[in-house]
């Protein structure tokens, strides 16, 4: 009897395409091969077969593969049909599959969810895979690949093993202490807890993975008609903002996300900053939004008079027909957005600054959920350092282990899993 449904989905690009790969996972995967291809090929070897429906009508000539579980991507029996990628072919093969008993279409992320449920991947790896599927820049790809490949999971396992060792040491002290005497932990025990807590604190101080999705935020600011929109267009390499010799043309915040040298950026063009009491209320709203954007900036390019911009702003001397400011004596960059002179040097400097603020290539980066769980573990270890009663210390170490288990998914809730795997596309 088949208790768990077998699922299938198109796992390659949408038709029309050169090849369409339909993946089938579950207890009826072998039966699906027998029904459509009339045979089961040798495991893990591609074999050419004619696919037919229940009435014997020819559907396609395709490569078929058979992967018996549990050593598969999902931990279940798995079959693949590599068909011609025409829309009608894919529809016909899927129609034949859905007519089989115990077989249904997969939901978004269901293949990955089964891999998680069957222990093929843990939660941190699944989150890394979700990030990898949505990665648009080289830096996003590298960070997601590190987590999907288990870099964070292996590190958490090492931390958990160290906590287990500390817990065993506490239990040993409790077991061999006299009832009359208070049990005491050796001084080295406290040092070891402190070292581990310090290591977790260092990880907690690293840039979060969400920064990669948001990108390094660069806000262009200055008074009206300072050349902000012209430089903005040059940086994003498109006519995203309207440019005009009329002061106050930009009245709202304009954002564009781009990648430079594989690093994600969000460039923000803003309304010109000036006093507008009694003036156009729409322009006043734009100026308020510009000030809000400045408060959230990672870097500010100031195109106004020298020294009048926000603290730590990059002084930019933009050479154009529309600027009439006195020359900047200490400009970080002198450029012409119209001709492009100096823009490349500015981009190079922005990339260097962004690399220091974003997760490093190939380094595992924590998302908000992982950061919260690691923070729980660090908090438990810091608390354990301050305690002298071994029983209380043992409880704090248990709390740290639970936090590690939650981080990699040994203890999870269905709602959280639904949210995660709902991010995946159908067929993954």
Residues of each region from the PLM?
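Switch I (G2) and immediately adjacent beta-strands of P-loop GTPase domains
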Residues: 48-68, 248-278, 299
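Residues immediately flanking
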Residues: 24-26, 85, 270, 306, ...
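A secondary-structure boundary/capping signal
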Residues: 25, 93, 222, 269-270
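Switch II of P-loop NTPase G domains
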Residues: 66, 79, 271-302, 306-309
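Short, solvent-exposed loop/helix junctions and linker helices
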Residues: 87, 120, 284-287, 340, ...
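C-terminal-of-GTPase-core extension/linker across diverse P-loop GTPases
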Residues: 1-14, 127, 136-259, 265-267, ...
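A glycine-rich (often HGG/GG-containing) alpha/beta subdomain
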Residues: 1-142, 146, 150
């Amino acid at each position: 009897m088949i208790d768990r449904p077998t699922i299938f989905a198109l796992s390659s690009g949408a038709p029309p395409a050169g090849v369409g790969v339909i993946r089938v996972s579950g207890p009826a995967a072998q039966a699906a091969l027998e029904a459509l291809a009339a045979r089961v090929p040798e495991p893990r070897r591609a074999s050419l077969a004619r696919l037919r429906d229940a009435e014997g009508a020819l559907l396609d000539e395709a490569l078929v593969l058979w992967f018996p579980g549990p050593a598969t991507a999902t931990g279940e029996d798995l079959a693949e049909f590599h068909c011609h990628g025409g829309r009608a072919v894919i529809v016909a093969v899927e129609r034949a599959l859905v007519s089989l008993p115990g077989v249904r279409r997969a939901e978004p992320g269901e293949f990955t969810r089964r891999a998680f449920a069957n222990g093929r991947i843990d939660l941190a790896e699944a989150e890394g895979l979700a990030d990898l599927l949505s990665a648009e820049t080289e830096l996003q790809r590298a960070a997601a690949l590190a987590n999907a490949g288990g870099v964070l999971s292996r590190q958490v396992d090492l931390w958990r093993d160290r906590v287990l060792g500390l817990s065993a040491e506490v239990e040993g002290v409790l077991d061999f202490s006299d009832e009359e005497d208070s049990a005491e932990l050796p001084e080295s025990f406290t040092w070891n807890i402190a070292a581990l807590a310090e290591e977790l604190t260092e990880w907690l101080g690293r840039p979060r993975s969400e920064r990669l999705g948001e990108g390094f935020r660069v806000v262009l600011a200055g008074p009206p008609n300072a050349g902000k929109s012209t430089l903005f267009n040059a940086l994003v390499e498109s006519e995203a903002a309207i440019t005009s010799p009329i002061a106050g043309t930009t009245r709202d915040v304009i954002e564009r996300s781009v990648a430079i040298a594989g690093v994600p950026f969000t460039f923000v063009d803003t309304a010109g900053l000036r006093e507008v009491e009694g003036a156009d209320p729409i322009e006043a709203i734009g100026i308020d939004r510009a000030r809000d954007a400045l408060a959230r900036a990672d870097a500010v390019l100031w195109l106004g008079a020298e020294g009048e911009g926000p603290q730590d702003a990059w002084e930019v001397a933009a050479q154009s027909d529309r600027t009439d400011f006195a020359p900047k004596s200490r400009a970080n960059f002198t450029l012409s957005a119209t001709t492009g002179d100096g823009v490349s040097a500015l981009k190079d400097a922005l990339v260097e600054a962004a690399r220091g603020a974003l997760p490093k290539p190939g380094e595992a980066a924590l998302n908000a959920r992982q950061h919260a769980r690691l923070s729980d573990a660090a908090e438990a270890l810091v608390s354990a350092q301050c305690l002298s009663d071994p029983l209380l210390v043992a409880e704090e170490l248990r709390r740290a282990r639970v936090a590690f288990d939650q981080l990699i998914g040994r203890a999870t809730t269905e709602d959280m899993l639904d949210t995660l795997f709902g991010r995946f596309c159908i067929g993954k």
